[in-house]
């Protein structure tokens, strides 16, 4: 593991811990100020309630994703059986257990990995991505997705994703707590501040996700032969052939995608796109859940001879 990948790992861990600690201090201070010791029981109740909902969602989400994307499990004898071999080879190189492989019958070119205690670990490729990437590029994409599983990114998103929801419910409860009180206006003002803080924490989580995506790219470059160059080509092909979209979401499913499909020029030669991204200054967007492809390409460029 090189210095940059260690840096990405440490930043991800510290960011997650920092977000959790910041939330704890804000929640504890506000509840103690307005409710005294009884306010601490409120946050415990909210934490247990939201945690229960999130765990249920985590357990059943693979089945919901399966229905949404019309996922079909790949069998060795099917026309997509070669995907099992690709994922098997990539999993061996990553020293992790091979996940189940699925094909998504709908959706633009993409891939994603997800897991739960009930469904186990899974990796899915959309049918359209198979039409534009060669075998080596698919293995590089698999190396990226397996990086998410190896780094326990699903669990990380579950943990820190609770925080904006908790802050929102805390603000919601303070609105009702303020009714009929002499200082009800203060409760309402704090509730508005909490709603704003919920959005701020969402932006912070998007930042963590961008780091997480870069770390998965580095994982592919360091574990898959020629992974850096093949992942660069895969990114360029996906952005060249995907329908343009400006939609940004911080949903867990969108965060787990390999690409977020920013607006692009259809039909552009992917090699020219790679060269352009190598030399451009990547724009910064705090509202994006993926790094700009130029930033991803430039990070991968550092790792072309790292395998």
Curated annotation (Swiss-Prot):
Keyword terms, alphabetized: Cell membrane, Hydrolase, Membrane, Metal-binding, Metalloprotease, Protease, Transmembrane, Transmembrane helix, Zinc
Query: Per its Swiss-Prot or TrEMBL entry, what cofactor is needed?
Result: Zn(2+)
**Membrane topology classification:** Multi-pass membrane protein
Which GO MF term does the entry hold, naming one?
Answer: zinc ion binding
Q: Where in the cell is it found?
A: Cell membrane
| Domain of life assignment | Archaea
- Which Gene Ontology CC terms are recorded? plasma membrane
Entry note: cofactor = Binds 1 zinc ion per subunit.
Name the residues annotated as catalytic in the UniProt entry: 145
Q: What is its EC number?
A: 3.4.24.-
Q: Which GO terms describe its biological process?
A: proteolysis
The residues the entry assigns to the signal sequence are none
Q: Its family? A: Belongs to the peptidase M48B family.
What name appears for this protein in its UniProt entry?
Protease HtpX homolog
Write down the species: Picrophilus torridus (strain ATCC 700027 / DSM 9790 / JCM 10055 / NBRC 100828 / KAW 2/3)
From the UniProt record, report the name of the gene that encodes this protein. htpX
